[in-house]
Structures are given as structure tokens and as C-alpha cells.
Amino acid sequence: MAYDWVWLLTDYGRRDGFVAACHGVIARIAPAARVEDITHEVPARDVRHAAVVLAQTVPHLPPAVIVGVVDPGVGTQRRGVAITAGGSVLVGPDNGLLGWAADALGGASTAVELTEPAFRLPSPAHTFDGRDVFAPAAAHLAAGAVLEALGPVVPVEDLVRLAQPRVEVGPGRLDTEVLTIDRFGNVQLAASMAELAVAGLTAGSVRIRAGGRSHVVAVGVTFADVAPGGLVLYVDSAGQVALAVNGGDAAAELGLESGDPVTVTGESPLR
């Protein structure tokens, strides 16, 4: 099966020529494919951030070959893989980056290790698998290569998975963690609206314990539900519970980073 689209997500940034090299490799092998970028601004080596962004983006893409490269283990024994899921193919390092995206597409169906030399560049470098392994594999798949031709099948249960973020729900209490922080400083938590509802914390005000401090926060549906500079707890566009400051930076205000613990309770003080 051929694909009209190839999508790229990396931590390469735009200062250097890394992204252009990947685009060029794909264009030379699969000139009919349209190559688009998800983002290249993932924080350097932050596999979990990349996994979150990819998982929350892929449901909105057409069937495609989707390349994700945030690869601190490049040049080591970690595998490169291609995974079919929901009519698309995910290509990248087997370091957990692709797993949540596969889940978001309905689950991984088949996976192969990218070992066949015919589907990579000649004499690949040890430190640029994005250009030398993943981009050519993606291009060949977009051009109609059979998945199993790229290398041996890997049982999907053997693929590397990231640890599941903490979400613990009880009556009037939700213990979770920061999943990611966007460029506006909005703090996305690992808990969903459904989990917030189970805790009974979907209306009025709640108390947030984060960054060693506690705050009373209004529960709203958008930023303007609080005055400028005010904190609001809401459900974001990905369906996750999130914290924002109207017109400001919630991460800076609360002193939070990815992975930090956050507890949400009723407005009465925590004991």
C-alpha cells in the first residue's frame, strides 16, 4: 500500500540542516509523497514529551507514514521499528516514543525491525538515523514497499513502552502528574475529564497542591472564565485536565515541570 503523506516529528529544531536532510531523502525516494512537519521543537532528548505530542496529533492526520525521532540512544543496540496502527505506519526508534501514538490509532497491529540495508542509505552514520534509517524507510513505505520487506517481525508486546503516568482517583481527590507543558505555559495533567468526574471535582472551585504550595482554583471551561491573571482548571483540547493562567504562564506561576506531582481535592484544606 502506498501513502500520499509522510509526517515528521523530531527534536532537531530549525537552526541546522537536519530537517531539510530528512525531507530531501524522502523526496528523492518517494517524490509523489507529500512531506509535512508535526513539529521539530520537541525539547532535546525528551522522549515522553514527543510521545505525548505524537499521540495527541495522530488521530487528526490522514492515513500516512508518520516518523518520530527523539533518539538519545542513537548508535546503540536499540532497535529501529515500523509499526502499523489504524491504517498508518509509525516509524522511529523503539524507545517508547511510538507506543502511545499506536494506542491512539487503535493499537499496534504489526511491527518490524528496520534491518534490511536496501531500505536505508548506503554507509549510514552512527549518529543520524533520522536521515539514514527512518527517513528512507518511511519513503519506501510511502512508495508502496511491503512492511515485512524492511526487516523481521517484532511481536508488538515486545515493543518498548513508556511508564504510564500517575493517575490515582478517590472520592474528592485526584493524585496525578504533569504530562506536558505547551508554549503558552498551560500545564496538561495526566488525568482525563472522566477521572476528574469520578473524583467529583468538575464544578465550583478546587484546591491544587503543586510545587510545594496549595492554591484555590476555579473550575472552568476556558481561560476567560477567570479574571486576567487568575488560575483555572479546565479540560483542554486533547481531553486532558489542565491548568492555565488567563493571559499568563501557569507553569511559571506554579513552578511546575513535566513529571511533577499534582494533587487536586475539594476546596477545603488538604490534611
Language-model-detected regions and their locations in the chain:
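Structural motif
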Residues: 5-7, 33-36, 64-67, 80-82, ...
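Conserved active-site and cofactor/substrate-binding residues in soluble primary-metabolism enzymes
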Residues: 17, 21, 30, 45, ...
